Regions:
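Alpha-helical transmembrane-bundle signature of multi-pass membrane transport and export proteins
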Residues: 1-414
Length: 414
């Protein structure tokens, strides 16, 4: 129990962090109340794995397309206002889904997902870039772990209950709860007292020109480049695997929306507990934290090979949970590494680029795997994704080991 004390102390004693953390919790809960019912709705309307995969692609794609804008906005303007506006706009979009039956066709929910993804594209770099401004440097590993696990916590709770809720109550009710969660998140962010960015000189140049600073920083700091590459490749494999959840549940396991929610919930549970367990094991040494990223990716790959062989929902969900313990650790530790490496005046743009790379990888992977699932069995696809992750994780660990050799508790730029 002592390993959980730092997390509780941070939540209890840092009010602004607590508000940001709770805002993320409720916002992510609403996200998963939205995604699971929409996946089932689109698949039932089209009987197409590609169309169902397009739901996830539509949610992810705007983050990639808006990279030149979202990061610059995060660094130029009040991050608190960005978060509130993003939440309120997404609340309105969620309510618009109540008209999906009246409008007809699958184009409308896909359009709403595109717009919702655009709102998230502004929310992520602003909220992630703000974190080092509300916690002390020594608290950053714990804070990053908690903020990253917020996604996992609510993916577990939101997806699992969202699938059951949509089945037992209605999909419309799930859309309303999604809107309420965004409104509550905006309220919590509005109560944050501390400034969410450091004082700085005005950033000159147009958005595209100012983003060049972020690219220059990344390509002149090999550690940052290595961390971004790990996140991008993981998103490429994970995005394709997750895109198959609805198809696996509905056609292979015959468990419908509830089964889809269970798989997403297992994914979220793994993302929630994986980073906490991993940080307790490796400790606060930056050398060990960053050096374990490749091993976490390897765990994801091995577990997804087991997912491919799983004959029941229970076994599949258990393997998915283990896989995303590794995936959540990879995401959290690489995010922490980037926060340690980056100065505040480019942090928002680099996290926008990071988010954009991840979302583009998820979009591409989801569409490709959705198309392949039209003609190729689901199990070989999952096994293949697992093998790719194992090979990349081991290679990344070997190639990047020298980068972390001189790190202990403080990460130097370079």
């Amino acid at each position: 129990m002592t390993s959980f004390r730092p997390y509780w102390d941070l939540i209890q004693h840092n009010a602004d962090f607590r508000r940001l953390y709770l805002a993320r919790l409720v916002s992510f809960a609403g996200d998963w109340f939205l995604v699971v019912p929409l996946l089932g709705l689109v698949y039932e309307a089209t009987d197409s794995a590609l169309a169902a995969s397009a739901v996830l692609a539509a949610q992810a794609l705007p983050a990639a397309l808006l990279v030149p804008l979202t990061g610059a906005v995060s660094d130029r303007f009040d991050r608190k206002k960005i978060l509130i506006i993003s939440d309120l706009l997404r609340a309105g979009l969620a309510l618009s889904l109540l008209a999906v039956d009246a409008v007809g066709g699958v184009w409308f929910p896909l359009l709403i997902m595109l717009l919702e993804g655009a709102g998230a594209a502004f929310f992520y770099p602003a909220s992630t870039g703000a974190l080092p401004n509300v916690v002390d440097e020594q608290e950053l590993p714990v804070a990053t772990t908690l903020m990253s696990s917020a996604w996992g916590t609510m993916a577990a709770v939101g997806a699992a209950t969202g699938g059951v809720f949509a089945t037992l109550v209605s999909r419309d009710a799930a859309f309303v709860l999604n809107a309420v969660s965004f409104a509550l998140s905006a309220l919590l962010v509005g109560r944050v007292v501390q400034n969410l960015q450091a004082a700085r000189k005005p950033i000159g140049g147009a958005g595209r020109e100012s983003n060049r600073d972020a690219f220059r920083y990344i390509f002149s700091h090999v550690r940052a480049l290595a961390l971004l590459s790990s996140k991008g490749v993981h998103s490429l494999t994970s995005g394709g695997a997750v895109a198959l959840f609805a198809l696996m549940s509905i056609t292979l396991l015959e468990t419908g929306d509830a089964g889809t929610g269970a798989l997403f919930g297992a994914r979220g549970l793994g993302n929630m507990i994986g980073p906490i367990v991993a940080l307790a094991i490796v400790g606060r040494s930056n050398r060990r934290i960053l050096g374990s990223i490749g091993w976490a990716m390897t765990v994801w790959g091995v577990a997804y090979i087991f997912v491919g062989f799983s004959p029941t929902l229970l076994l599949a969900a258990a393997a998915v949970c283990v896989a995303h313990m590794g995936g959540g650790t990879q995401f959290t530790f690489s995010t922490y590494g980037l926060q340690e490496l980056m100065p505040d005046d480019v942090r928002g743009r680099i996290f926008a680029l990071d988010f954009g790379i991840d979302m583009m990888a998820i979009s591409i992977s989801a569409l490709i795997l959705g198309a392949l699932a039209q003609t190729v069995a689901i199990r070989p696809l999952l096994i293949g994704l697992g093998l790719v992750a194992v090979v990349f994780g081991l290679a990344w660990t070997t190639l990047t080991r020298p980068l972390w050799a001189d790190l202990e508790t403080a990460t130097d730029e370079g």
